[in-house]
Swiss-Prot record:
The keyword Kinase does not apply. The lineage of its organism: Bacteria, Pseudomonadati, Pseudomonadota, Alphaproteobacteria, Hyphomicrobiales. Its EC number is 3.5.1.2. Homotetramer. One of its GO terms (biological process) is glutamate biosynthetic process. It catalyses: L-glutamine + H2O = L-glutamate + NH4(+). The gene is glsA. The keyword Methyltransferase does not apply. This is Glutaminase. Substrate binds at S64, N114, E160, N167, Y191, Y243, V261.
């Protein structure tokens, strides 16, 4: 194993000193209030060893990173029937684009763009009241993170609801094709709330361990999903996890990952570690600017890219 402690601390120190931090998300008012100077990085391996740097224990809004876990949960509920409602291809379009959805008859291109994640949320909601579905998602997050203190930031959820007109348009358009089956307000309510879950880098890195270890969560002591399903979720993270910046992330970092407009990125080094980085300043595609740079530095120093050293 490389000397992860010194690597992580070196990267955190370098990121702290960089002036080019990107811009915080402004279209969700609560996220616009976040201090752009924040930076945290955590790496956790299968033996529970932790390397942490910067603001590793500062909670932030996980936003679209939650889509990895709702996809995992929905696949556990309905299996491959999920793929009748959502595709598995990169979109090449902004995460909240409606143009592609119109061309493809209401079927979202993948589960990590907003339309796809709303459709996945609708599957989880089926047969439940919204509060029950949301409770199931939150309990799953607490379980994989091994931390029952994780909660939803209600201010962020309310802020998203007040300004979520594009998401409402996506959901109503999918409803017209019966891709959404529940009342749109119910589905969007659950969606806004799971995106508003607040977690730290340490908690998110712990939550991603089952994806790094073939579906087995080494700290929980048993399997969360099958090895095949973990491999397939990782594949979708690699190809679709960073909106229309997914190809560039694969080129530069070479790890399965999922970003969120709260500035977090969850990345998976299969068989080696789960990684979470947070820096709220975003690039033009809506991904953490310094987060991507930090992960690129990490894989160069560890040789963890899935494509080789």
């Amino acid at each position: 194993m490389p000397d992860l402690d010194s690597i992580v601390k070196d990267i955190a120190a370098e990121m702290r000193a960089r002036p080019d931090r990107g811009a915080v998300a402004s279209y969700i008012p609560e996220l616009a209030r976040v201090d752009a100077q924040g930076f945290g990085l955590v790496v956790i391996d299968g033996e529970g060893r932790v390397a942490a740097g910067g603001d590793a224990d500062t909670p932030f809004s996980i936003q679209s990173i939650s889509k990895v876990f709702t996809l995992t949960l929905a696949l556990g509920m309905v299996g491959d029937r999920l793929w009748r409602r959502v595709g598995r291809e990169p979109s090449g379009s902004p995460f909240n684009s409606i143009v592609q959805l119109e061309r493809e008859h209401g079927i979202p291109r993948n589960p990590f763009i907003n339309a796809g994640a709303i459709a996945v949320t609708d599957l989880i909601l089926s047969g439940h009241q919204p509060r029950e579905a949301l409770g199931e998602i939150l309990r799953f997050m607490q379980f994989v993170a091994q931390d029952d203190s994780i909660t939803i930031d209600e201010r962020v959820a309310a802020s998203e609801k007040r300004t979520g007109f594009r998401n409402a348009a996506l959901a109503n358009y999918m409803r017209s094709f019966d891709v959404i089956e529940n009342p749109v307000d119910y589905t969007l309510g659950v969606y806004f709330h799971h995106c508003a879950i607040a977690m730290t880098c340490r908690q998110l890195a712990t939550a991603g361990l089952f994806l790094a270890y073939s579906g087995h969560h080494p700290l929980a002591g048993h399997s969360v999903i099958s090895a095949e399903r973990a491999r397939r979720i990782n594949a979708i993270m690699l190809t679709c996890g960073h909106y229309d910046g997914s190809g560039d992330f694969a080129y530069r970092v070479g790890l399965p990952g999922k970003s969120g407009v709260g500035g977090g990125i969850l990345a998976v080094a299969p068989g080696k570690a789960s990684i979470c980085v947070w820096s709220p300043g975003l690039d033009a595609a809506g991904n953490s600017h310094l987060g991507r740079i930090a992960l690129e530095m990490l894989v160069k120093r560890t040789g963890w890219s899935i494509f080789g050293v």
